Each structure stands twice: as C-alpha cells, then as structure tokens.
A protein has these predicted regions:
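Compact alpha-helical subdomains of small soluble proteins
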Residues: 63-113
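Short, surface-exposed acidic
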Residues: 41-49, 81-87
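Bacterial N-terminal signal peptides
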Residues: 6-18
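Amphipathic alpha-helical segments that form the core helices of the histone-fold
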Residues: 49-63, 75-78
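Short N-terminal segments immediately surrounding and downstream of signal-peptide cleavage
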Residues: 28-42
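C-terminal region of N-terminal signal peptides and the immediate post-cleavage residues
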Residues: 16-31
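Extracytoplasmic/secreted proteins, especially bacterial periplasmic and envelope-associated proteins
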Residues: 31, 50-54, 86-94
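Bacterial Sec-dependent N-terminal signal peptides
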Residues: 1-5
Length: 113
C-alpha cells in the first residue's frame, strides 16, 4: 500500500511539473541562422537577423525598389568575401523567413538574373 501511494505521489509530482514547465517555441532567428550556416554564412545571429528583417522593412517601405537593391544592402552589410551567390541566398532566406508576402519581388529578380 505504501509503495502504491509512493508511485501515485510520484506521478502527481511529475504531472504537476509538466503542467508548469515552459513550453518550447520556435525561434525564427535561430532557424534563420541555421539556414544561413547551410550556405556558409556565419556571424552573430542577432546581427544577421537584423539585416534580414531590414531587407523586409526596406522592401515594405520602398527604400529598396527591387531585390537587386536589397542584395546591394546585404552585400554592404555582410563580411568582406561573401560571394554574390551567398548574398542572394541571404536575401532569399530573409524574405522566406520574415516577409514571405514579398516572394514575388525575389522571383522577379531571379527571372532577370
């Protein structure tokens, strides 16, 4: 009987612990950094996320009229030695992660490249 009571108490404690445990949530900046790493683009996660989010802000506000202007902004913001291909991968990943409604802008640029 004591053994059963101990098991029941253990289960109650376990359930209570699960109920108050913080829930895991996706971190888009980490996902973005991981995608960039796949392209060989490294750097501070927060800085790269800031650049990526600014790509979207610049497209939304009209500062960048097209993805070519966004790519120029990214190229100037990333480390020297970043290839043109990596710049475009960065822009594409930024749009996919932070402003997917701007996909047509990147698609038009891809058709012109």
């Amino acid at each position: 009987m004591i053994l059963v009571a101990g098991i029941v108490l253990g289960i109650i404690v376990l359930i209570a612990g699960l109920a108050v445990a913080p829930h895991a949530h996706a971190d888009p900046d980490t996902d973005y950094a991981n995608q960039l790493h796949g392209y060989g683009i490294y750097g501070l996660k927060d800085y790269n996320a800031w650049i990526g989010k600014n790509v979207c802000k610049r497209l939304y506000s009209g500062v960048d009229a097209d993805a070519f202007k966004s790519a120029a902004f990214v190229s100037a913001s990333l480390q020297r030695g970043t290839s043109t291909e990596q710049v475009w991968q960065f822009v594409d990943a930024a749009v996919n992660m932070y402003c997917p409604d701007e996909r047509p802008v990147v698609q038009r640029a891809a058709e012109r490249r």
